C-alpha cells in the first residue's frame, strides 16, 4: 500500500530493504501476466521446470483469474481448470498451490470460519484438491477478540493425512511461529462452567 501511495518514511525504507535482503539469492520466479489460459500456464510451468529442475512449487494467484476459453457452464469450466492444474502437478511432479476466493455465504453465519462448501464453484475444486487450507483471523470480525494477532490455518481436507488447525502469529502480513496451546486457548476459549442447580424434592 505504501508503494502505491509513494510516501516512504524511514521505517518503510528499512522494511523494504529487509524484504529485498530476504529475497536476494532465492530461486523465486514470477510471471506477472493477465488473461493467461490454462494451456499457457501449463506451457510456462513446464518450460520453466525444464530450465530449472529444482523448482519445488507452482503458485497460482488466483484460480478464477485464469482465462476460460470454454463455452460450457461456468462451474464446469472451473472444473476443467481444477483438473488441468491437477494434471500439471502430476505430470511435472511438482505441487501446485492455487488460491481461490470464497463465496459470500460465510458472512451470513455466526461462525465465520470458512468451510469447503464456501469455495466458489466448490464441487470440482473440493474433489480434485489433495489438501485444502482455509485461513481465518477472528479479529477481522471481532476487534476485541482474545485471539487478536493470531491466524488459524484450518486444514479442512487432507487426502493422505489428518485434519486440524495450525496457529500462527500474524504480524504485518507475515505468519510467524507461536505457541500452539496458548493460541488454541485464545482462539477457542473454554466456556465457563455453570453452577449446578438442584431441584427441590
Regions found by a protein language model. Give the residues of each.
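Alpha-helical context
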Residues: 6, 17-21, 61, 108, ...
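Cytosolic-facing regulatory segments adjacent to core modules
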Residues: 1-54, 68, 166-167, 178
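Basic/aromatic-rich interaction segments and small domains that mediate binding to polyanionic partners
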Residues: 162
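Generic marker of residues within folded, mature protein domains
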Residues: 20, 143-145, 158
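Conserved GTP-binding G-domain of TRAFAC-class P-loop NTPases and closely related GTPase folds
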Residues: 152-158
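P-loop NTPase motor core
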Residues: 33-152, 174-176, 182-201
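Active-site donor-binding loop signature of nucleotide-sugar glycosyltransferases
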Residues: 33, 157, 170
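Well-ordered beta-strand positions in beta-sheet-rich domains
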Residues: 152, 165-169
Amino acid at each position: 500500500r505504501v508503494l502505491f501511495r509513494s510516501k516512504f518514511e524511514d521505517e518503510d525504507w528499512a522494511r523494504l530493504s529487509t524484504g529485498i535482503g530476504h529475497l536476494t539469492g532465492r530461486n523465486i520466479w514470477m510471471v506477472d501476466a493477465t488473461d493467461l489460459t490454462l494451456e499457457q500456464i501449463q506451457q510456462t510451468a513446464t518450460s520453466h521446470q525444464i530450465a530449472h529442475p529444482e523448482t519445488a512449487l507452482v503458485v497460482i494467484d488466483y484460480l478464477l483469474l485464469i482465462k476460460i476459453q470454454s463455452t460450457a457452464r461456468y462451474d464446469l469450466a472451473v472444473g476443467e481448470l481444477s483438473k488441468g492444474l491437477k494434471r500439471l502437478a502430476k505430470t511435472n511432479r511438482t505441487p501446485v498451490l492455487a488460491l481461490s476466493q470464497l463465496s459470500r455465504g460465510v458472512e451470513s453465519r455466526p461462525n465465520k470460519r470458512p468451510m469447503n462448501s464456501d469455495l466458489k464453484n466448490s464441487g470440482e475444486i473440493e474433489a480434485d484438491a489433495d489438501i485444502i487450507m482455509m485461513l481465518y483471523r477472528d479479529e477481522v470480525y471481532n476487534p476485541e477478540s482474545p485471539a487478536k494477532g493470531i491466524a488459524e490455518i484450518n486444514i479442512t481436507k487432507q487426502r493422505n493425512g489428518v485434519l486440524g488447525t495450525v496457529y500462527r502469529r500474524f504480524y504485518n502480513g507475515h505468519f510467524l511461529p507461536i505457541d500452539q496451546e496458548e493460541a488454541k486457548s485464545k482462539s477457542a476459549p473454554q466456556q465457563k462452567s455453570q453452577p449446578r442447580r438442584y431441584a427441590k424434592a
